[in-house]
Amino acid sequence: MRYQRPKGTADILPGDSEKWQYVEATARAVFKTYQFKEIRTPMFENFEVFSRSAGDTSDIVTKEMYDFHDKGDRHITLRPEGTAGVVRAFVENKLYGPQVLKPYKVYYMGPMFRYERPQSGRLREFHQLGVEAFGSESAALDVEVIAMGYNLLKTFGLTDLKLVINTLGDQQTRDDYRQALIDYLEPHFDELSDDSKERLHKNPLRVLDSKAPEDQQFVADAPSILDYLSPEAQAHFDQTKTYLDALAIPYEIDATMVRGLDYYNHTIFEIMTHSKALGKGYTTICAGGRYNGLVKELGGPEVSGVGFGLGVERLLVLMDAENIAVPTDDQLDVYVVGIGDTASATTLKLVQALRAAGYKAERDYLDRKPKAQFKSADRLNARYTMTVGETELADQVVNLKAMATGEETKVAMADIYQDAHQVLDK
């Protein structure tokens, strides 16, 4: 039997893993400047955490979640997105209390799981970077989160970016708009897709998110939520636009954008890019928004939140397509060449001493001839070689060679053990 990875998953091998490390390290550095700190939550949660947060009619809950009953008959779900687990942790650990500074800012990174058709940059096990900020209803925080996502993508070298925003308003806005949508769509009920028929009276806003061809003409002509904003919702949206203008971040407004999760309200946004690597036209690379009711939905008090998620696989596909070079630090500092069996213990001691001093060091483990060892040093792009043979052992020295110049010197082993930096950093 041939064992293969499950469909929709990927092995991240050396050569690629360095790109992931770069993305994660860069994101951490950017998040740190905004005073966001890392949170780590379980990769699986109780089913209700996601069914309550994402919405019973969302594609995630109805079609895409990996859920099962464990041996204790608990209904468990592999996390399909990051926000709900973070909100659950926020509530369970009482981080909404007055003893915790607000806004409470956290970021996460790690694998998520959705049962969907694998395609370029979209897998069943995929990885997200995300941020969440709790405890402020200010539109300035919405814009800070948007700016952070926008600047992060620019830091990665992406240039053809488009920010699209919308508002889902407050509860009054959504109640009024919900009824307007039902009134508009009901006469066309028989022409809607099966999914949209099912959603029409449960959550008509989900119809606007439909990708079914038969729904597109109705989505295009649907009433605009912008015509149903309450004064408070209008003021929040106006402030958001004012702050974006102040930061000189260009944006477009798409009144049909609703996002794929039911917990959003007020500001929602998507940052898109135009790349053939992800298909025709603009595709979303980073998305998020405000969710003022989610903390209460998961058992906490009325505390507002705002955040975004960013797909790492899609980001890396884009970076490859744009030929964006990822900085690497894979040069070996020292390759220790051993000649003869008697040198083996000494070469092992030398590489350990070099590593303890902070250098990247390697030796041979295949009992090869010196010529083959020097070839390995070349392939590993070593800065130096240290050669130890019978003569060097007798004199307790190594033959140190600078690979760039070919210059060779004799160095006492004691000097290396005592202070390798004095030897290598002259």
From Swiss-Prot:
It is found in: Cytoplasm. The keyword Lyase does not apply. The keyword Cell inner membrane does not apply. It catalyses: tRNA(His) + L-histidine + ATP = L-histidyl-tRNA(His) + AMP + diphosphate + H(+). SUPFAM superfamilies: Class II aaRS ABD-related (SSF52954), Class II aaRS and biotin synthetases (SSF55681). GO terms for molecular function: ATP binding; catalytic activity, acting on a protein; histidine-tRNA ligase activity; transferase activity. Transmembrane segments: none annotated. GO terms for biological process: histidyl-tRNA aminoacylation. Keywords: Aminoacyl-tRNA synthetase, ATP-binding, Cytoplasm, Ligase, Nucleotide-binding, Protein biosynthesis. Its EC number is 6.1.1.21. InterPro entries: aa-tRNA-synth_II (IPR006195), aa-tRNA-synth_II/BPL/LPL (IPR045864), Anticodon-bd (IPR004154), Anticodon-bd_dom_sf (IPR036621), His-tRNA-ligase (IPR015807), HisRS-like_core (IPR041715), HisRS/HisZ (IPR004516), HisRS_anticodon (IPR033656). Its main location: cytoplasm. It is an enzyme of class 6 (ligase). GO terms for cellular component: cytoplasm. CDD domains: HisRS-like_core, HisRS_anticodon. PANTHER family: HISTIDINE--TRNA LIGASE, MITOCHONDRIAL-RELATED, HISTIDYL-TRNA SYNTHETASE. Belongs to the class-II aminoacyl-tRNA synthetase family. Homodimer. This is Histidine--tRNA ligase.
